[in-house]
């Protein structure tokens, strides 16, 4: 019996090692495609964040991706890379100029490896399984709409279509796009991800429980 158990554990270890090796190979292939497509000219992938001033932020051409694997959901990311639609109503780093769109699209053969690469880029600040998502989170909804001015800057889905402001990234479809654990980490430790930003800091204004409710509410957005 001990021999059988040892054999099983050995095979399991080999299988796990093989899976990890394949994942690393896929990520490495994706990195080559990412760099070969010149994606790094607009998106930096080396963390942690180094911006110290508004000039540093304005020098960026596009969102940083060094924590993409903690922020995004893989299936959404792979689909978006093949058919990229604007997430921000306004151009990156602007609150006045509309987003013209036109983000380069990848082929299906390119999008898979690039997704593997981007999903390998994670932040230790994001703890998995922290946010419990339900179909409805009334406390989170009240905070999002009434207690804090989230809807003043972010579009979000409503029964009619969508509502909210235009200056921040749209949250329409956030339930499929964003990892709720990252949303919570971003609310709790915003400077880890964006040392210089326009979004208000809610640390000290909202409790951790409130932030969890907001993250859970955002996760319901379709």
Locations of regions flagged by a protein language model:
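Bacterial N-terminal signal peptides that target proteins for export
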Residues: 1-12
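C-terminal segment of classical bacterial N-terminal signal peptides
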Residues: 14-23
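Sequence/structural segment immediately N-terminal to covalent heme-attachment motifs in c-type
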Residues: 25-47, 133-157
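Gly/Gly-Pro-rich "capping" loops immediately C-terminal to redox-active cysteine motifs
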Residues: 31, 44-79, 155-186
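Short, structured interface segments
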Residues: 41, 107-129
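Axial heme c-ligation environment in periplasmic c-type cytochrome domains
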Residues: 54-70, 82-112, 129-132, 165-173, ...
């Amino acid at each position: 019996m001990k021999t059988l158990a040892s054999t099983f554990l050995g095979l399991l270890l080999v299988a796990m090692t093989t899976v990890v090796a394949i994942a690393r190979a896929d990520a490495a292939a994706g990195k080559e495609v990412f760099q070969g497509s010149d994606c790094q000219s607009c998106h930096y992938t080396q963390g942690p964040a180094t911006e110290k001033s508004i000039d540093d932020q304005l020098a960026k051409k596009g969102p940083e991706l060094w924590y993409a694997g903690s922020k995004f959901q893989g299936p959404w990311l792979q689909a978006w890379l093949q058919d990229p639609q604007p997430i921000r109503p306004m151009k990156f780093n602007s609150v006045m100029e509309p987003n013209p769109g036109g983000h380069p699209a990848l082929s299906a053969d390119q999008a898979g490896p690039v997704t593997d690469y981007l999903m390998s880029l994670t932040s230790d600040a994001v703890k998995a399984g922290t946010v419990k998502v339900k179909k409805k989170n009334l406390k989170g909804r009240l905070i999002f709409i009434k207690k804090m001015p989230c809807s003043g800057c972010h579009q979000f889905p409503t029964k009619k279509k969508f509502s909210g402001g235009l200056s921040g990234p749209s949250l329409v479809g956030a339930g499929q796009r964003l990892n709720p654990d990252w949303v919570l980490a971003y609310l709790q430790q915003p400077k880890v991800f964006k040392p210089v930003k326009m979004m208000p800091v809610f640390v000290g204004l909202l409790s951790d429980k409130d932030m969890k409710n907001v993250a859970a509410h955002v996760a319901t957005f379709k």
